[in-house]
């Protein structure tokens, strides 16, 4: 309690905006009349609140388009431009994004940058780690856990833009496929926008390709293998495919820091 009281005393009240006087509205003089519009201070405050509501992990605090390093790789530069243009044009284009590529190339960085750009435009967004979401849903089946599956999924079902990070990271099972289908189909039917990242490149499942024996075991798993062919097809109705391919982004910075 004492700590909280000290924090309250130490807080410095924000200065009143000299433009709007704290109302959040400012006058705009047109040629023939006078109008009011939202003040910049209100928009900044709104963006800050929406960013907090998006529940981004603190490890991504510094992730935006200006901090993404392409390292001179044309494919990464092209991916960055495509994603940033999409974020700038939203909501003119409400089709989502599917960012696929090898681990460590900065897919989540770019997806988070897009999410932040949308909050600056007043869009309600939510970050979801695919593995954490499935784990929380599984835990909700425990009688000692108060949150129900529906309560956990409601924000995922209702938020205008959801970033589903690392799709396919959990070993596939009927339950996993059913849960992924529920999430994606619900958002699809509600015409909500979804940004997805995955380390698994696009491709049909092994069962669809009818691969057997050594050929099947040597083949790299695809997105179709991890989420099921039906949901892979649904993704392409919901999202623009963006291939993010290049040198390991995280390894590059670890190497730079060791020099």
Regions found by a protein language model. Give the residues of each.
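Pre-Walker A (pre-P-loop) alpha-helix and adjacent loop at the N terminus of AAA/AAA+ ATPase modules
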Residues: 69-97
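P-loop NTPase Walker A phosphate-binding motif
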Residues: 109-123
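A short, basic N-terminal segment
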Residues: 1-78, 254-259
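Walker A/P-loop nucleotide-binding motif
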Residues: 93-111
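Loop/turn-to-beta-strand initiation segments
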Residues: 123-124, 158-161, 190-196
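Short glycine-rich substrate-engagement loop in P-loop NTPases that contacts/grips substrate
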Residues: 74-80, 119-158, 174
């Amino acid at each position: 309690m004492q700590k909280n009281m000290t924090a309250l005393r130490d807080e410095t009240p924000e200065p009143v905006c000299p433009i709007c006087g704290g109302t959040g509205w400012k006058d705009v003089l047109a040629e023939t009349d006078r109008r009011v519009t939202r003040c910049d201070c209100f928009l900044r405050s709104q963006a800050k609140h929406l960013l907090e509501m998006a529940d981004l992990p603190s490890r991504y605090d510094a992730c935006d388009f200006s901090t993404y390093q392409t390292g001179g790789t044309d494919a990464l530069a092209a991916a960055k431009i495509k994603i940033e243009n999409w974020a700038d044009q939203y909501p003119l284009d409400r089709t989502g994004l599917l960012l696929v590529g090898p681990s460590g190339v900065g897919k989540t960085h770019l997806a988070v940058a897009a999410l932040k750009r949308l909050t600056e435009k007043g869009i309600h967004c939510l970050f979801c780690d695919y593995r954490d979401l499935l784990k929380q849903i599984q835990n909700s089946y425990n009688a000692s856990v108060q949150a129900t599956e529906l309560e956990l999924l409601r924000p995922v079902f209702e938020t205008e833009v959801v970033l589903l990070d690392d799709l396919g990271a959990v070993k596939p099972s009927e339950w996993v496929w059913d849960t992924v289908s529920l999430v994606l189909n619900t958002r699809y039917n509600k015409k909500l926008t979804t940004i997805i990242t995955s380390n698994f490149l696009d491709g049909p499942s092994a069962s669809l390709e009818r691969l057997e024996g050594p050929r099947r075991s040597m083949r790299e798993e695809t997105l179709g293998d991890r989420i099921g062919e039906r949901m892979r097809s649904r993704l392409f109705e919901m999202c623009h495919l963006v291939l993010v391919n290049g040198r390991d982004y995280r390894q590059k910075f670890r190497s730079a820091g060791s020099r």
